[in-house]
């Protein structure tokens, strides 16, 4: 992702860790 979020959480999008959009991805 490219929204500049500094979170490091599991993300389905990256099949691992998404450093810049995990919160938004999870909330969807």
Swiss-Prot record:
Catalyzed reactions: L-aspartate + 2-oxoglutarate = oxaloacetate + L-glutamate
Cellular component GO terms held in the UniProt record: mitochondrial matrix; mitochondrion
Cofactor(s) the protein needs: pyridoxal 5'-phosphate
GO BP field: 2-oxoglutarate metabolic process; aspartate metabolic process; glutamate metabolic process
Domain of life (superkingdom): Eukaryota
Protein role: Plays a key role in amino acid metabolism. Important for metabolite exchange between mitochondria and cytosol.
Similarity comment: family membership: Belongs to the class-I pyridoxal-phosphate-dependent aminotransferase family.
Protein name, entry field: Aspartate aminotransferase, mitochondrial
